[in-house]
């Protein structure tokens, strides 16, 4: 089982803990292990997600008069961990982030096994 992963996210290196969606006492499933290995094999998905995340955040970022670094994605997003959903049919990994404009719900960048990227509040994967 992978407990942390070193990844380059939009030009910066991070070591992110990997959290698995499991009930108490339940073991990580084979599908979850396959999902994280598939994600490792397609790390380029992270770089490709940057424009999707920027588009999702654009309105809030542009209306923020206090943020002088609007062109720096890390001025409003901080990757915190990778979350591996327990789902045999559609294995997904989410990069869970702190989000300056929604501290309560944060932001999730969800990667499906087919490379599809979805962005939204963390509730979209939890």
Positions of the model-derived regions?
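Long, contiguous N-terminal structural blocks used for assembly/anchoring
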Residues: 1-70
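Acidic, proline/glycine-rich low-complexity IDRs
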Residues: 1-13, 17, 72, 76-126
